[in-house]
Amino acid sequence: MTHADVVEGVRAAIAAYTLALDDGRTDDVVATFAPDGVSEMPGMGRLEGHDALRAAYARWTPRRPQRHVVANTLLTEWTDDDARAISDVVFLLQGKDGWSVQMVGRYDDTLRRDGKTWKFARRSLTPIE
């Protein structure tokens, strides 16, 4: 597996998560995680495993249009089966007066290859104040 293959797979996992999250597709969000995957976000605590992830993300389906804009993804470590990446994220929410920034933060991701796709083993969000 080449560096480019890993980068492409990691970016695809990040995009799949983001699109599913913004569209409110809970099962598709959960599918981006390994079965024992962990999500850590302020206000959510530590969620481990598909059942805990599904229960939490089902409560956070969007009630109005939203977008998580992810940029500057950098692969920091990788092997053929594991990878670490960091990305910046801006969370936008549409209100009656248009779109507004709700949060700026950084994802710190550990991913594991599952066949041809990459899954989150751990996804941590740190807001930037």
Briefly describe each language-model feature range.
Residues H68-V70, Q102-Y107:
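Short, surface-exposed coil-to-beta transition loops
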Residues M1-D27, A31-P35:
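Short, low-complexity N-terminal intrinsically disordered segments enriched in polar/charged residues
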